[in-house]
Each structure stands twice: as C-alpha cells, then as structure tokens.
Amino acid sequence: MKVYDCCDKVRELYSLIGSGDQGYIPQAITCAVKTLNDIAADEALPKEARERAAFAAANLLISDFEDK
C-alpha cells in the first residue's frame, strides 16, 4: 500500500513525520501491533472494527517483519 492510497488523516501525519514536525517511531511495527491490539480490545467500538484490527494485528505478528 502506498501513502496516496490512505485516508487524509494518514497522509497528513505522514507529511508531518516526514517534515520532522511529528515524532518518528523507529519501532513502527510494534507501534502498529500495540495500536491494533488496543482497538481490538476496546469493547466500546463496533465489533466489525475490532475484528478487522485483530486480524491485522495477527497478520503482522505472523509476518516476517520484525522491529530490531
């Protein structure tokens, strides 16, 4: 997926991180998994959103990518 395929909010933050106005997190995969886990665990959110977050987190955990 490319940044231009993402929503406006993602593109905005991408631009801010790239310009140095927003902090960059070197362990991006860990950050993503933690965020997706938080979404999946939040019972106040719709079930479909929680299931999608859980599926994405599980796939990241199984993938070959690893923060070092």
Curated annotation (Swiss-Prot):
Species the sequence originates in: Aliivibrio fischeri (strain ATCC 700601 / ES114)
Family per record: Belongs to the UPF0253 family.
Name of the protein: UPF0253 protein VF_0662
Coiled-coil residues: none
